[in-house]
Each structure stands twice: as structure tokens, then as C-alpha cells.
Amino acid sequence: MNTAIQAALDHAVQTLQQEGVLPSDWNNSSNLTRTKDRSHGDFASNIAMIGSKAAGMKPRDLAEKILAALPEVADISKAEIAGPGFINFFLNADQRFAILDQIQAQKESFGRSQSNAAKKIQVEFVSANPTSSLHVGHGRGAAYGMTVANLLEATGAKVDREYYVNDAGRQMDILATSTYLRYLELLGQNLVFPKNAYQGDYVKEIAQGIIDKDGDAYVREVANVYKDVPEDVQYAEELDSEGNKVVLSGDKEKHIDGLIANSQQLLGEGYRVFHQAALHAILDDIKDDLADFGVTFNQWFSEASLSAKIDEALETLDQRGFLYEKDGNIWFKSTEFGDEKDRVVKRRNGQTTYFASDIAYHLNKLQRGYTDLVDIWGSDHHGYISRVKAAIDAMGYDSKKLTVLLVQFVSLWRGGEMVQMSSRSGQFVTLRDLRKEVGNDAARFYYVMRKSEQHIDFDLDLAVSQSKDNAVYYIQYAHARICRMLEKAASTGLQFEVSAARSHAARLSLDAETEILAKLAAYPDVVLRAANAYEPHQVGNYLKELAALFHGWYNEHKVLSDDAELTQARLLLSINVQQVLRNGLELLGVSAPEAM
């Protein structure tokens, strides 16, 4: 319906341009939206307020001219001017009921469209280092990324979901060396485990797996492993005035780097055994965790596979004049593209930087023919956006193809108090822990109920409560309530048939019923707006509002009554609410239970 109204408004604009009321080059950037207040009609346009300056007249005066030039629109009973110059459109009664036919015809497809059918989009998300289990912060990125991808698919886009596996960096070497040191410990070697190594028990489990398979084949003298390694950091017993540790001596970074170098030299090819065992153990754990959370990927892309692409990317930048040498390092001229400073891409020792890998990865993405790239990063990567976009432009591509969405941190609350997010050893509360406590549905829902760049205070008590204050429970309960109502109707021998019930739709004459019909009709627009804005919370809020309308109506008015025609009409309305709730919950990755 909004398409027909918008076409009529466009026609009116063309007429007024021909008459000289509006400039011929005026671009109509107005919005046509569904009204929130039923007294204001079904749709409202701000076109007169947008165009008033160009027309040189007051918005209400322009609105009158637009109405005069507006062609007749089928199923619109009237259009009127309101407030400072809004144009409100009122649907006739038959058109309001048409949404019931549309939902029943489209079922699971209702709300889906082909609006973004021309787009091939890659959504890269989570991409956590495979060095430990996913924590609750990663969980938010997982839920958000999966739901954004779902929404884009629902609007017709071809979407690939990708996880970038950081399997070639220093953190993996720290994990591999941590595993080797635990391996030596488990085989009776005495050593002081480094403070900057990975401390979790899972490292011992990986090491034990290597022992079970290969025994003591990789044992080397501990003295040689620690030979010429700089001293590990030593801390004072007391914290400083700000609660931070006070360094007395040593350097934890140089210490672990020395252990990595010695382990690699002593083990030779055997070092890869520890590297790969640790990588696969953690990556398998991450894959299982995400799959259990309903988050899946088309591609798990290995950073280690990028070596040739790094050379290609740097050669491209060099040929285009955007690399230079200084102090033995190779630098990228990112300041020429608005970055705050130039960036090193290759160090004097010949090692390329993580940034060089990221440039190569985005070159690889662009060469795969995507129309749009969506990267979902943690908020701490904010400063990284400008340099990546600079590299894309410098290689001759359009950085506007890349959208970077930042995901803020998550705080957990229980009993009105913030939950300690990490232990003394630095182990964060895991996604698996959260899912075990509140369930997948609550986690998936509450993770996306705020804009991604906004901090989330996750109330664990609320997430498991059975009350209307718990939005996901309230929505699911509306769906289950309708299922129970239909079962009750069937148990009494009531014969419900959609086409017959449709003939009695005019009995849905209450304001509450008209409001529900309007809310149902708004769903496709909500999905499209949420997809284009990368804002899943719009769908979540819509479902909350629809559930509230249904519960309020159900509590005040009997659906199953002695009035057969009214019963049929209200059952028809209910099953349409049920369908839309189910469709919306599916996009959010939340179940629609039939009983609660």
C-alpha cells in the first residue's frame, strides 16, 4: 500500500514541478511512514515540510497544493493535512482487512522481500582469536552478526557469513608455547610457568592429548627452553593508588617471546604439532559453541592462507606509490587518505604486520565480487577503521563498499549487582556459561535489543523471569497462548476454516483490533528498515509491541464465545498474529514455543 501512496506523491511532485510550484531539479527525500496514533490515519508523509523551502511557501500551503495534485489512490478513503504540514492517509476498512489475506497467502515468507536482491553481501563477524573459549562479549557479536545476516537475506540479498581465523599471529604462538610448557610439566619437568602464557586448564588438556598420542617425543631440556630468555615480570605485593600492579623488574612480553623462539628452534617441525593441536582444539570448541547457539558460517577463512595475498597487496600499494621506507620499516601512506598517521606494513626484520594481513584479507574479499562488505568488530577496534578504508582506496577500490559495525561491551548483572566478569587468572565468563544460565533464546534476544554501539547491561534475573517485564518471555508467551487457544477451540469441536472466517472479518471493529491489524501490516516495513540500518532491535521492539497489543486485547475480550461469526473472525486475527510473531522470532534466532 505504501508503494501506491508514494507513487501518487511522486506524481503530485511532478505536476507541481511542471506548474513551477516546485523547482524542476528538486529531489524528493521525504519519508512515508506508518502512523503510531490511529487518529492520524494509517500513513503519514512529511513531503510538504521537506519541500516548503524549495517552494518558498509554508508547509501547510504546499501540502494543500500537493493534495490538489494528488491522483486518486485505490483503497485510500481520505487524505488530510495535520499539524505543521503532515499529510495523513486513511485506508478504507476493506484494505485494512487485506493484510489478513496477505499473511495467510505468504505464511513464513510474510515480511520477506526482494528489495536487496541485487546485492551480494559478505558479513564477517565474531572472528575471535582461537586461543580460548568465547566469552560473553564474543557472544554479543555472534548474535548480532547472525541476525544482521538473517535480515539482509530476508530482504533478498545473497549473504555469506564468514569467520576470520587468526591462526598465524603471535597469540597463536603464545598458545602453542603455553601448551608445550604444560606438556613438559605433565611429563615431570620443573619450570616456572610464564605470567603472559595462557593459564586455563584447557591448555593442560590439549597438552595431555599430545602425550596420549606421542608420549615424550617432544621433551627437551628445560634449561635449553629457558636459555638466554629475558626475565619474566616481577610485581610488588602491593597495588598502586589506582589498583594497578607495580612492576619491580622484568618484561613479560620479552620473556614469552624468548620462550617462543627457543621452543621453535628446539622442536623444529615438532613445534607445528603443538601449534596445530592447540588451534584445532580451540577452533573445534568455538565451532561447537556457536553451532549450539544457532550461529553458523559459510566460510572459516584462515589468516595463514594469506601469505601470497599479502605480497600481492603490498606490491599493488607500492606500484600505486603508497609505500615508502623509513628506519628500515616499510610504511603505508595512510595519512593521504585521512588517517591520523602512516602505518607500518613490514618491519625491518622482514616480518609483515597484522595490518598487512588485514589489507590482504580485504583485497581477497573485494576480489570475490561482493557488492557490500560488512565487518562486525569489537568497539576497541574503532581506531582501525580509517586505516583499513584507506588501504582499500589506495589499492584502487571503493572503501564505501565496506561498512564497519562496532559492538560495545556487555556487563552481566545478578541481584542488582554487577557480576565479576573475569577471574584472577583472567578467564572471562564464557558464552557457554551464559547460555547455560539463561538459555539460547534469552541470550539471542537480549544481545540484539540495543544498538550495537551501545553498552548492554544484561540482567540475568530478568532474562529467566516469567513476567511481562521479560520481553522474550512475553513475546513467546503470546505465541504459546494462541497455540493453546487453537487447541481449546479444536477440543470443543469448533470448526475453523480460514476462508470462511475471512468473510466475517468486518466483525473486527474494536479499536484494539484495528490497531493489531495496522501493526501486522507494518511488519514488512520494519524488517526492511532493520536490515538496511543493521538494527535488529527494531524487529525485537516491534515484536514486543505486537505481543503487548495481543495480550491486552486477549485479556479484555473473549475470543471463543457464543457468537460464532465473531469467534471465527477473532481466531483469524489470532493466527495472523501467531504467524508474524513466529516469523519475527525466527529472524532473531529465537524459538516460538507452542507451550510454556
Curated annotation (Swiss-Prot):
GO cellular component, one term: cytoplasm
EC number: 6.1.1.19
Protein name listed in UniProt: Arginine--tRNA ligase
Cited Pfam families: Arg_tRNA_synt_N (PF03485), DALR_1 (PF05746), tRNA-synt_1d (PF00750)
UniProt motif ('HIGH' region) ranges: 128-138
Molecular function, one GO term: arginine-tRNA ligase activity
Family label: Belongs to the class-I aminoacyl-tRNA synthetase family.
Organism from which the protein derives: Acinetobacter baumannii (strain AYE)
Intracellular or extracellular location(s): Cytoplasm
